[in-house]
């Protein structure tokens, strides 16, 4: 399963990797800010300079993936063909390995048959293939790590072993160093298990504290580095105020309109250089909040549009938008269909027992929340795609089982009617 998934993704890489070798804007298409930071690390400049000049330390992105890319650059060269192929191959490997937690999560809750179908669906899952083979970013590693976090959670409520809870905390902290969005759901999942242990009368306090301390232990070196570099506490990454600015401005034709990023326009780039990163982010946060205060009704509307986009892929049918996003119409059908089938599977899981459904509900409620209020990207939902796959498969197989049972009932009724008629 894993080898077939890897082979498919690597085959797609062969067609898509050349676009990352475009030298325009000093190879910006090769991993954007992550590529810049990785280059700075290789040059001995530290974790710094996410844009077009040496601008000093940064917390623009979380550290794990830039460090990984820096390792690739160190071995294969900066912005080389070999580096592009190597990092895309690693992304493909992360995506292929996600088959394992997908299979195990499905098996834990829904049995072997659902697990096999879920694993194989992940092998051929379009989002998984495309983002692994074409997108040099933390996304596929985030997907793998979050799937592992979720898998560990499913076993956590059954144990009070301190080592298991420490493992959960360490894994969650490590995953957050790759993508902080993990922390939008992991604490709530841990709290749910903690509560379940408490209700059952099992040991709960020490395991919970151990998990929290493990998160702190894993993430604190990065926090200490940030405090040393910027003189204030910055957890994981420090550009949340800027993310508000990107999605809350006078342009609503796109979910992330161009012209508001230091990589897009000279004006934003100059402001970043003049104010420094923390000053720039604070300034953009103030601009975003001022806009929101002046346009409260629009902000509510935009928030609702972002909710719809996350779950259906729909933003607009406007000519300008579809010219920018030409594949959105087929994506809307696929994304919406997947969501509907997933919700059917979630409903069936809730009928089986709320204890089964609640971890999924926690993730679906908490994970995308920050994107509703800032701005979404097409890759933001990818880390929870494994849960969509598992529940969608369970929904389809449950529907098939119900239809088969209904058909058998009808056949039995017809046979009984014929038997009664013959007796008469």
Annotate the PLM regions.
Residues 59, 63-67, 77-100, 119, ...:
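Loop-to-helix entry region of an early transmembrane alpha helix in multi-pass inner-membrane enzymes
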Residues 109-113, 141, 149-167, 175, ...:
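Membrane-interface transmembrane helices that cradle and orient dolichyl/undecaprenyl
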Residues 10-23, 29-57, 64, 71, ...:
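Extracytosolic helix-loop segments that constitute the early lumenal/periplasmic catalytic or substrate-binding loops
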Residues 227, 233-309:
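Membrane-proximal stem/loop segments at transmembrane-domain junctions that anchor or position
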Residues 155, 185-216, 223, 396, ...:
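Perimembrane helix-loop-helix junctions
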Residues 81, 86, 93, 291-360:
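Membrane-interface anchor segments at the N-terminal boundary of transmembrane helices
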Residues 5-8, 115-126, 144, 151, ...:
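Short helix- or helix-capping micro-motifs
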Residues 86-110, 147-152, 340-344:
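Transmembrane-helix motifs of polytopic, lipid-linked glycan transferases
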